[in-house]
Amino acid sequence: MQDRIMYIENKSDGDGLTGSARIGRVRFSKTGKTIYYRGAELQSLKGYGYKANYFDVNTGDYFWVSGPKKNGQDTLYPDRVEVDEDVRIEYWRDIRGIEATVDESSFRSEGKHASWRVVQFTKSRKV
């Protein structure tokens, strides 16, 4: 099985759009349709999920799993992202390229839609 550092967000923890977010090492099944992370078995929704692409076969919780972004803006909306201890150095050094922060166990992601909201607010304020 192949393993890789990924962004994992439990959409069932929040309102369906946001939830607890982590950077951690996952293992993929041979087919790549199942991901194993911290004892959970996540199966692909095959494109049928709303803001989620995997679900936990044991709990039914929905997850968004993707490769971590180099700029750290993995979340849809501003939120805190925890970094698992076993991937911390590799994540900060190899993915983010910021060796000075290897001791950081979490960071704030401004979110994918943060800049869009600022632009929309600015446009709506023009007279």
Stretches found by the model and what they are:
Residues M1-R25, A40-V127:
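Mixed-charge, low-complexity intrinsically disordered regions
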Residues K30-Y37:
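Short, conserved beta-turn/loop elements at beta-strand boundaries and strand-helix junctions
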